[in-house]
C-alpha cells in the first residue's frame, strides 16, 4: 500500500485498521481478477483504506464487499463513458443493469462479469439487510444513478456536437449528483453497519444523502475541472447559476459547505434513534470530501479562478 492517498488515510490509523485495509484490498483483487485489466492497481489499496477509515468497526468481509461494489461502479462508469471501447451504447448498458437488478442471477449473462458480479453483490447485501428495507432503497438509488448516468452521457454528447447549449449549474447538478452514485454507496454502507433503522429513520437517512451527494459531486468537479475542460466533459466550474452567478472555485467551495451543513442538520435528530447509521453517514461524507484536498488530487485553483473570470 504505497501511494499518497493511502498514506493520507492510514498514517494515523490504528494498526488493526491498517491490517484490515491490506486484507480487504487482497480480497478485492481476487474478486476483480477476471477484469483486472480495466482497473488501475492502486485503486484497490485506495478504496480499501477509504472504507476501513470510514467504518473501522466492520469486519473484513464487509470492508471487501464495499470495496467490490465501489469497483463495480468504476466498471459502470467506464461503460457509460466509453462507447467506442466497449461497443455498447450507454442506453443499452443502463437497460442491462436494470434488468439484472430486477431479475438477479437468472437475468445476468453467465459470461459477463459485469452482470454476474452485480447480481452476486446484491445477493450479499440482501443477506445482510434481512427484512430491514434498506436494500430496496439501495436498488432504487442505483437504478436512478444509472438512468442519470445515461442521460448525462447523452447530454454531454449533444453539447459536444453543438446541438444543445450548456445547462445552468442547478440543472446540471440535479442530474450530476444522482450520476455520482454516492447514495447507493452510502446505503450499502448502512446495510453493512447493520443497525436496521426503522422506516422513519430510513426516510431521514435517505433524505440526508441528497445534500451529501451534491457536496461530493461539487468536490469532484472542483478537483477535475482542468481535465474535464481538456476532454470536453461537463463540469460545474464552467457553468452559470440561474441568477447569473459564475461558478468560480470559491463559489463551489461555499456551496459544498452549505450542503455539508444541510446534511448535518438532517442527521442531528437521528443520533438517538439511529446513532450508528448517522455516525457512518457523517464519517462517510467527511472522508469523501477530505480526499479531494490531498495534494495529488488537487489542481491549481488560482489558475481556475482566472479561467472562469
State where each predicted segment sits:
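Alpha-helical, largely C-terminal catalytic domains
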Residues: 1-309
